[in-house]
């Protein structure tokens, strides 16, 4: 049996007396599309921060691609193939759109053993990524010139520029119109079809349902459901805790 790409066992995190994560177990297979949902304060962001190395868990383990991530800093985890996009995009404001994509290629991809992208390679990959997300006509623009949905696309493209095995997309659609949400969902599915495993954190249920092959639900730091979307949304505990029914 193939080992999971991401394997979390007994993960626990406290902030003083507050239990943010309580014994979380989660396995994500290579190529999966997983939706991570739950009410505000349920532990989603804390879990992602522990996976990515922004926070240190007090108990349990995180393994990625067969390797323990214990003791690795966030940038070291990125070098191993973990990438994250943020709800509030964080581009380099003084760099062009294309320049923002070059940074992870130079400092992340080229930092991996045995990898060296030439300037021509980087230019070609930038152009390909910009076409993929529909920003090829914005390559020389600064981030301040972009619309809200274009900023979200740039944020996703920056994450992809690091050539991850796993992308964690955090609230990539908040505040967008329905048409823009559909556009982002289509992009994420396209990324997945190109071989990237994706965990999507999102409150827009129609987006989560159309994207996810599997749903994981957190409430009060505990995993209360994990399964296919059609089964999870009918779980009485999920309805009470998350959907308010």
Predicted regions and their residues:
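Glycine-rich phosphate-binding loops of nucleotide-dependent enzymes
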Residues: 2-245
């Amino acid at each position: 049996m193939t080992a999971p790409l991401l394997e979390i066992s007994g993960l626990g995190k406290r902030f003083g007396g507050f239990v943010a994560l309580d014994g979380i177990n989660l396995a994500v297979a290579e190529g999966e599309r997983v939706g991570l949902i739950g009410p505000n304060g349920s532990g989603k962001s804390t879990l992602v921060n522990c996976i990515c190395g922004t926070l240190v868990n007090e108990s349990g383990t995180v393994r990625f691609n067969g390797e323990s991530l214990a003791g690795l800093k966030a940038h070291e985890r990125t070098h191993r193939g973990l990438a994250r996009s943020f709800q509030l995009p964080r581009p380099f404001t003084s760099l062009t759109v294309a320049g923002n994509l070059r940074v992870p290629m130079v400092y992340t991809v080229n930092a991996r053993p045995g990898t060296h992208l030439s300037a021509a390679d980087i230019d070609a990959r930038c152009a390909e990524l910009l076409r993929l997300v529909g920003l090829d006509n914005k390559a020389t623009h600064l981030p301040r010139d972009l619309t809200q949905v274009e900023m979200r696309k740039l944020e996703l493209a920056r994450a992809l520029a690091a050539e991850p095995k796993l992308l964690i997309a955090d609230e990539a659609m908040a505040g967008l119109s329905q048409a823009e949400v559909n556009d982002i969902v289509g992009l994420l599915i396209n990324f997945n079809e190109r071989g990237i495993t994706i965990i999507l954190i999102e409150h827009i249920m129609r987006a989560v349902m159309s994207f996810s092959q599997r749903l994981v639900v957190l409430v009060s730091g505990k995993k209360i459901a994990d399964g296919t979307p059609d089964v999870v949304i009918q779980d009485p505990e999920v309805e009470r805790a998350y959907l308010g029914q």
